[in-house]
């Protein structure tokens, strides 16, 4: 059951592929008119017929067909997506093709993304040449399993590969937007074949701090925030959560006879973890799925965080955990916080134990290339350079290090890193009682006399700051009584996670 309609409705998010971005520049003519149909010149190579021989038909879509083909020079077998120029009657159809090629190029080389070779064109068609995957769709393998479900071990292998794709997309400023079993192919028919993401037709580049306002995707896998017209990278993780639920129990977590009924289920109801086989599935697996299917996208695990979860770790180890885009965003955001908010976050970070910080430990280790227990300016530069939409200059990176580096030694240790990258909203949503306990403990570090308030004198004593403290208190002092209550302190901490995860994204549901 799909939500896909014409692609003309989806460009209202201000993304690079949309009205204001790079996706339009290449398409615009001298007067801003995009040539369509046979008039379209994509600038791709024109020698497809000389390079490849088309073979059997593999499948077809709205605008074209996919064929097996052979490279005339190397005899290598490939897949070719042939798109009819005559069907590109609107400029957005031209943009869609250019964007898909751009995305395939951006993700080139990732082990779980179908390999892109080249794009060609002639007067009638565009040809996108890709890796040939002959193992069939993930959906077909699910249906072939007994009771249409995987063992936990096999499911974890599949889910890990999907999460790696999502994390890589998000680092490149991309959201897939149509994660579903049909869009993952196995390289071969072998049982242990690698999984490859394909069909980036609904994917798009995102601008940090923005959200998509259109409804796209496939009904069973669409995230609540997509239906609310305010979606971003987190929607991919929700879709993977739905797929994981299906892999483990053979049923969809949200189902109804109608599309609108499915949407109501997604928005209002929680998945059922009581029916068989869930009582026989490990608590660790259930915890994993539940944290991917959190309705609030701010509290949902990111793709990189999910890869650090105990259930999905390869052999119990966090092997090749990619950088988490939200961790990099949080570090940039930390610079903008008031001194009091920074101190409050450091106090909160100090209350967490090693198990609660396992995902951030993985991220710290990924950035700490020389494994000396601290992050240098150069290591942080290298990490932030991988955040494609941002790629900060040297002075900006130094500014981040100086803000995070509380002991002013020019390095970032793990405790400093945690304070700057903590997902406060996840703490609030995942375990309310634990949040209350941790925030109380952080508050108590400032409330020296234990009277239930933080005064300017106590703040000065705990921070060592000189000069007037009153301006620092004003941000949190909602009732203007000159001191900070526990509720006001908690409110201040919660605002730390409000802006750092607000990032934006593209479409097989399609509603304008």
From Swiss-Prot:
Residues 52-312 form the Protein kinase domain. One of its GO terms (cellular component) is plasma membrane. Ca(2+) 2 binds at residues 405, 407, 409, 416. Autophosphorylated. Phosphorylated by MPK5. A lipid is attached at residue 2 (N-myristoyl glycine). The keyword Membrane applies. It comes from the Eukaryota. Residues 318-348 are annotated as: Autoinhibitory domain. InterPro entries: CDPK_Ser/Thr_kinases (IPR050205), EF-hand-dom_pair (IPR011992), EF_Hand_1_Ca_BS (IPR018247), EF_hand_dom (IPR002048), Kinase-like_dom_sf (IPR011009), Prot_kinase_dom (IPR000719), Protein_kinase_ATP_BS (IPR017441), Ser/Thr_kinase_AS (IPR008271). It is a lipid-anchor. Ca(2+) 4 binds at residues 477, 479, 481, 483, 488. It is found in: Cell membrane. Residues 355-390, 392-427, 434-469, 472-499 form the EF-hand domain. Induction: By the mycorrhizal fungus G.intraradices colonization in roots. Residues 1-25 are annotated as: Disordered. Activated by calcium. Autophosphorylation may play an important role in the regulation of the kinase activity. One of its GO terms (biological process) is intracellular signal transduction. It catalyses: L-seryl-[protein] + ATP = O-phospho-L-seryl-[protein] + ADP + H(+); L-threonyl-[protein] + ATP = O-phospho-L-threonyl-[protein] + ADP + H(+). PANTHER family: SERINE/THREONINE-PROTEIN KINASE. May play a role in signal transduction pathways that involve calcium as a second messenger. Functions upstream of MPK5 in a signaling pathway that represses defense gene expression and negatively regulates resistance to rice blast fungus. May be involved in arbuscular mycorrhizal presymbiotic phase signaling. Phosphorylates the elicitor-responsive protein ERG1 in vitro. Phosphorylation is calcium-dependent. Belongs to the protein kinase superfamily. Ser/Thr protein kinase family. CDPK subfamily. Interacts with MPK5. This is Calcium-dependent protein kinase 18. It comes from Oryza sativa subsp. japonica (Rice). The lineage of its organism: Eukaryota, Viridiplantae, Streptophyta, Embryophyta, Tracheophyta.
């Amino acid at each position: 059951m799909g939500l896909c309609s014409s692609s003309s409705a989806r460009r209202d998010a201000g993304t690079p592929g949309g009205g204001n971005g790079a996706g339009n520049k290449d398409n615009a003519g001298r007067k801003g008119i995009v040539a369509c149909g046979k008039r379209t010149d994509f600038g791709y190579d024109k020698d497809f017929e000389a390079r490849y021989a088309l073979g059997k038909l593999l499948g077809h879509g709205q605008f074209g067909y996919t064929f097996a083909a052979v490279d005339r020079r190397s005899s290598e077998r490939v897949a070719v997506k042939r798109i009819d120029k005559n069907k590109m009657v609107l400029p957005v159809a031209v943009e869609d093709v250019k964007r898909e090629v751009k995305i395939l190029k951006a993700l080139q080389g990732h082990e779980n993304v179908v390999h892109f070779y080249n794009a060609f064109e002639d007067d009638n068609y565009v040809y996108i040449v890709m890796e040939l995957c002959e193992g069939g769709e993930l959906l077909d393998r699910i249906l072939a399993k007994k009771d249409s479900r995987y063992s936990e071990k096999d499911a974890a292998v599949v889910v890990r590969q999907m999460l790696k794709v999502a994390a890589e997309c998000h680092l490149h400023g991309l959201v897939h937007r149509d994660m579903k079993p049909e869009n993952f192919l196995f390289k071969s028919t072998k049982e242990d074949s690698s999984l490859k993401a394909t069909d980036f037709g609904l994917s798009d580049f995102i601008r940090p701090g923005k959200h998509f306002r259109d409804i796209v995707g496939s009904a069973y896998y669409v995230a609540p925030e997509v239906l609310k017209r305010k979606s971003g990278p987190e929607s991919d993780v929700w879709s993977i959560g739905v797929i994981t639920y299906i892999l483990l129990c053979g049923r969809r977590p949200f189902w109804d006879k109608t599309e609108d009924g499915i949407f109501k289920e997604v928005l209002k109801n929680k998945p059922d973890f009581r029916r068989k086989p869930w009582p026989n599935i490990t608590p660790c697996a259930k915890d994993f799925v539940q944290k991917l299917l959190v309705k609030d996208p701010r509290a949902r695990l990111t793709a990189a965080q999910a890869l650090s979860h105990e259930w999905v770790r390869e052999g119990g180890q966090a092997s090749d955990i990619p950088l988490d885009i939200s961790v990099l965003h949080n570090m940039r955001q930390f610079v903008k916080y008031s001194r009091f908010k920074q101190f409050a976050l450091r106090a909160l970070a100090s209350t967490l134990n090693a198990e609660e910080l396992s995902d951030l430990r993985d991220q710290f280790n990924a950035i700490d290339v020389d494994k000396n227990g601290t992050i240098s300016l150069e290591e942080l530069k290298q990490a932030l350079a991988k955040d494609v939409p941002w790629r900060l200059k040297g002075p900006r990176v130094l500014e981040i290090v100086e803000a995070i580096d509380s002991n002013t030694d020019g390095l970032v240790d793990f405790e400093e890193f945690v304070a700057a990258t903590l997902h406060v909203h996840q703490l609030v949503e995942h375990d309310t009682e634990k949040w209350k306990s941790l925030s109380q403990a952080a508050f108590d570090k400032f409330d020296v006399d234990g009277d239930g308030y933080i005064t300017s004198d106590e703040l000065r004593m705990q921070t060592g700051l000189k000069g007037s403290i009153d301006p620092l208190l004003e941000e949190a002092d909602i009732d203007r009584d000159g001191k900070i209550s526990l509720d006001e302190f908690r409110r201040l901490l919660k605002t730390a996670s409000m802006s750092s995860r607000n990032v934006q994204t593209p479409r097989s549901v399609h509603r304008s």
